[in-house]
Regions:
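Surface-exposed, low-hydrophobicity beta-strand/loop segments enriched in small/polar/acidic residues
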Residues: 1-114
Length: 114
């Protein structure tokens, strides 16, 4: 158990039109003006869909949040990309620079500041 919690610090959630493939909890990318869709593997993401309703999604685009990870993710400022299954992975090229403050390898999660 962690002695500190970063959850929701600085959270900025913006509303976007959402493609049909967007589900809560998954990483999304900008697909058109004001619209998001699900990420494929290695996509640079815009944020995480927090809620989806009526063709719209609340997307966290800034602040701390816990993300599912694939593979190993280092602490510190790293480049992350979508893993294609809703979470993130270390980017091989490009990606999004984010601050990783905690990694739980057993739970396959990381606390990240976008």
């Amino acid at each position: 158990m962690s002695k500190v919690s970063f959850e929701d610090i600085g959270a900025v959630i913006a509303t976007f039109a959402a493609k049909d493939d967007v589900k809560p909890g998954q990483m999304v990318k900008i697909t058109a003006n004001g619209e998001v869709g699900a990420c494929s593997a290695n996509d640079a993401f815009a944020g995480q869909a927090q809620s989806v309703r009526g063709g719209f999604a609340g997307v966290q685009v800034k602040g701390f949040l816990t993300l599912p990870i694939t593979g190993s993710v280092a602490l510190g400022r790293v480049s992350l990309a979508a893993d294609g299954t809703g979470g993130v992975q270390t980017a091989t090229t490009g990606g999004v620079t984010a601050l990783v403050v905690s990694v739980d390898a057993a739970a396959k999660t990381a606390v990240v500041c976008l």
